[in-house]
Amino acid sequence: MAMEDREVMEARGAGESCPTLSKVAPVDSMPEGKPKASLDAEVPKLELPTLEENGICEDRDCPGPPRSLPPKSGPNAKGQAGDGPGLESVELPLPLETEHRNAMELEKVRMEFELTLLKYLHQENERQRQHEEVMEQLQQQQQQQQALPHQFSGSLQDLLLPQNQFAMFFYCFIFIHIIYVAKETVFFLFSKHYLFCLAAILLCLIKTLWS
């Protein structure tokens, strides 16, 4: 019994830094029928967990009660634990990338629409400019055509207007001579071809009344 007490005390002295979870049963509570060999076998069994716990406490310098080691996380556990954040980190960029792609496509469509609109506006402006040029050319041609008769009539009027007294006397002589010739011609026609003259006069009257 003294030997057992000594071993228990040694075990307690080794584990002073951390209290042990398992307590050794008192010697008086042991059954009397157990042999000494069985008692010697039980004492080392009790010492092993206390030594392991003391080693854990000495390594970690924990003044409190012994803490159980965390379970080793294998690759499966690590993968399961990382499934949540991994999925979130993979799923979150997808909508952002899709939204960015949609925004780029919308911007591209808008730019194409603006380019097409500018193209049609340029074509319309060019067509309007050509139409205005053609209309200006037509107006110039009409003005030139209208100006030619005025110029000719003006030049003819300038030509017919007498520049001096001699020209006016010459015009009067020509006018009197034309009147005299016309009178002689009419008298000659009536005297020689009165039937023809009457027929011509009747035709002119009928045409005037008919119209």
From Swiss-Prot:
Its record classes its membrane topology as: Multi-pass membrane protein
Keywords, A to Z, come to: Coiled coil, Membrane, Transmembrane, Transmembrane helix
Region entry Disordered: which residue ranges? 1-90
Q: Cellular component terms, GO, for this chain's entry?
A: endoplasmic reticulum; membrane
Q: Per its UniProt record, what Pfam families does this chain match?
A: TMEM247
Enumerate the transmembrane spans.
159-179, 186-206
Xref: InterPro entries: TMEM247
Q: Tell where it localizes.
A: Membrane
Bias (Pro residues): 63-73
Q: Where is the composition biased (Basic and acidic residues)?
A: 1-10, 31-45
Coiled-coil positions: 119-148
Q: What is this protein called?
A: Transmembrane protein 247
